[in-house]
Design a protein with these regions (language model features):
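C-terminal alpha-helical "lid/dimerization" subdomain adjacent to the S-adenosyl-L-methionine
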Residues: 7-8, 26-30, 63, 147-192, ...
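Class I SAM-dependent methyltransferase SAM/SAH-binding core
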Residues: 54-56, 60-106
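A conserved beta-strand element that flanks and buttresses the S-adenosyl-L-methionine
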Residues: 118
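Conserved class I S-adenosyl-L-methionine
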Residues: 2-47, 62-66, 88, 164
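Local beta-strand N-terminus motif with an aromatic residue
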Residues: 50, 114-115
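Short catalytic micro-motifs in class I SAM-dependent methyltransferases
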Residues: 121-122
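C-terminal lobe and adjacent flexible extensions of AdoMet/dcAdoMet transferase-like proteins
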Residues: 210-215
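A short glycine-rich, Lys/Arg-flanked "PGG" loop and its adjoining helix->strand segment in the class I
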Residues: 130-142
């Protein structure tokens, strides 16, 4: 039986509340593997000037800590569903950074607040991906970018993941929702008003994508 959005968010919250204290540990866990995405996120962000950045699904604030070290004087905001993740992120006292507990599908920020939004290995936990895209479009400034790193695969592999692997993951108590392909992202953009500028499948089934708000 398919899980409801409420159930999936509850499972995700439970998973990451439990993981918060060990998320930054140097163990060979799936969380440690997520760090391999950070250089590509920074490289993409660096292609254009920015002042205000939002990291959606920020976890313990690792991406923001890297950005703040490399680009001091900018303004950084992180949002995550897990209060304990936000607690750990805030305890790092990263300069010019604020961390907020909230739902990425309904971002609690003013319109036109950010030059760019990053989202690393969090998007597959969102039950309503179009709501996330629309919320990002609202808080991005004209011409602003949404940069997503996640998992993807070819059409046959994606069907297998979503039909078999995701339900198995639910049995382990994890709230993964789905993995997506290019056609999915094209639809998300059509329904949210964003423009898909880049969609790549990189090594390790990694999705690297860039969406832009019109000027």
């Amino acid at each position: 039986m398919a899980k409801s959005a409420k159930e999936l968010k509850s499972m995700t919250l439970k998973e990451f509340e439990k993981a918060a204290e060990q998320f930054d540990n140097d163990d060979p866990s799936v969380y440690n593997m997520c760090r391999k995405d950070y250089p590509d996120i920074l490289a993409e962000l660096e292609k254009e000037e920015f002042t205000d950045v939002l990291d959606a699904g920020c976890g313990t604030g690792a991406v923001i800590a890297l950005l703040a070290e490399k680009y001091p004087g900018k303004h950084y905001t992180g949002i995550d569903l897990s209060p304990k993740m936000i607690e750990v992120a805030s305890a790092k006292k990263t300069e010019n950074a604020v961390f907020v507990c909230g739902d990425c599908e309904n971002l609690p920020f003013e319109d036109n607040s950010f030059d760019a939004i990053t989202c690393s290995m969090s998007f597959h936990h969102y039950p309503h991906p179009v709501d996330f895209f629309r919320s990002c479009g609202r808080v991005l400034r004209p011409g602003g970018r949404l940069i997503i790193r996640d998992m993807t695969a070819g059409p046959i592999k994606l069907k297998l993941i979503n039909a078999v692997e995701i339900p198995l993951v639910h049995l382990l108590g994890k709230g993964d929702v789905a993995c997506y392909g290019r056609k999915d992202f094209e639809r998300f953009c059509r329904e949210s008003g964003l423009k898909l500028e880049l969609f790549e499948q990189r090594k390790g089934f990694r999705l690297h994508s860039v969406m832009r708000k019109s000027v």
